[in-house]
Amino acid sequence: MERNRYFVWTVGCQMNVSDSERLESALQGVGYTPAEQAEDADFIVLNSCSVRANAEEKIIGKITDIQRIKRERPDTKIVLWGCMVGPNNQSIFKKKLPMVDHFVSPSAVDEVLALAPNPIYQLDEPALPVADWQVPPVNVHVPINYGCNMSCAYCVIPLRRGKERSRPMEEIAEEVRRICARGAKEITLLGQIVDSYGHDLPGRPDLADLLEYLHETPGLVRLRFLTSHPAFMSEKLLHTIARLPKVMPDINLPIQAGDDQLLKVMKRGYTVAKYTKLIERIREIIPNVSLSTDIIVGHPGETREMFERTLEMVENIRFDKVHIAAYSSRPGTKAADMELDPALAVEHGEKQYRRIALERLQERIATERNEECLGHEVEVLVEEFTKGKWRGRDRNNKLVFFEADGDWYGKVVNIHVTETRPWWLGGNLIGETLAIGA
């Protein structure tokens, strides 16, 4: 078997994907080549997620699948990386998963890289979060802060990723410059709570300052960011989004529930009225904004009446997208302790009922909102050609499909919308747009 081949398998959020892509870039920089399957690799990395139980189950299943490789080739190195690996559970995992050689905490790319046997080269410069530059990606995700200082009752992330740590502005800017110089057009800034960026840095720069700092990067066409928390969505940030043409009017602002009592139990730090007032202010400052949110159904203590108030809230605000999850218990969290009380636990069937009811409501709302685009022109950054059509995203992050001859990859085009569905738009190509920064 060819030596110095790696296999990276990733589950979880976009932060995990970005970490894995950065690791792959670094491994290639020290002389490794990617393997299409774990059986062909001598260095195997599993980047894990612990936000939901099914994500952990996927990783355990994958480890079970590859333990045969370890039996056949004992010198193969296997690394479990990511949010499953906390400061207090490594000894447990070592007993439970003896086929794994190393356990590494989230985002520690350099630590994983140091475990790769027999590197051929040394890295000349920090690796970029892109696994393959043969065809430059249109959109690249760049983490700007790690960890979380909040203490939401249901969330295990602070226990696994630790306290917030912001990257210096110049470090981020240099990375963005290098990425755009290689051909990327759109940068999405990532953070567990991205709008709390900078509070731990000298001078306390914030996300608005960072957006301003990155805005004139040569080659940069679009800037996005996710995920935000209502507590840090400042007037300064909103006015910056409205003023800077490369910053897309697209905000993900999780509310998690539409009942004040449940929000207090979740330790979210706001009421429905306060959140709704913020939404109204966002729409006042950025009239063309697209708004998405996250909602958990079946959280311990959520009654049917509380859920009905969540439906009412969604109907009133009319989000463009709602990411819906049935509550999943996470060991070590306040909510997991609550679920031990049968009076507070929500049965599986009831969770699914609530999830489906909310999905149906949001599908209707998304259908109605997208129908408002019919007959209008939208500006689309083209990301790929798939199934005979070009696909991209408009400024509001809506998927847009169109048919056209020629090569439109990475170009910004105007599309006349002739067709809508709940989750995408379709239309006819008008022509290329002279995008700012292109």
Swiss-Prot record:
Q: How would you summarize the oligomeric state and partners of this protein?
A: Monomer.
Known NCBIfam families for this protein? Answer: miaB-methiolase, MiaB/RimO family radical SAM methylthiotransferase
PANTHER family on file? CDK5 REGULATORY SUBUNIT-ASSOCIATED PROTEIN 1, MITOCHONDRIAL TRNA METHYLTHIOTRANSFERASE CDK5RAP1
Question: Which residue range or ranges hold the MTTase N-terminal domain?
Answer: 4-125
Residues in domain Radical SAM core? 134-368
Main site of residence?
Answer: cytoplasm
Gene3D superfamilies xrefs:
Methylthiotransferase, N-terminal domain, tm_1862 like domain
Name of the protein in its database record: tRNA-2-methylthio-N(6)-dimethylallyladenosine synthase
Q: What does this protein do?
A: Catalyzes the methylthiolation of N6-(dimethylallyl)adenosine (i(6)A), leading to the formation of 2-methylthio-N6-(dimethylallyl)adenosine (ms(2)i(6)A) at position 37 in tRNAs that read codons beginning with uridine.
Keyword Nuclease in annotation: no
Residue ranges occupied by any TRAM domain in the UniProt entry = 371-431
Q: Which reactions is this enzyme annotated as catalysing?
A: N(6)-dimethylallyladenosine(37) in tRNA + (sulfur carrier)-SH + AH2 + 2 S-adenosyl-L-methionine = 2-methylsulfanyl-N(6)-dimethylallyladenosine(37) in tRNA + (sulfur carrier)-H + 5'-deoxyadenosine + L-methionine + A + S-adenosyl-L-homocysteine + 2 H(+)
Q: Which residues bind [4Fe-4S] cluster 2?
A: C148, C152, C155
The gene designation is miaB
Q: Where in the cell is it found?
A: Cytoplasm
- Could you give a GO molecular-function term held by this entry? metal ion binding
Enzyme superclass (EC)? transferase
GO (cellular component) term, any one: cytosol
Family label = Belongs to the methylthiotransferase family. MiaB subfamily.
- EC number, as in UniProt: 2.8.4.3
List of residues binding [4Fe-4S] cluster 1: C13, C49, C83
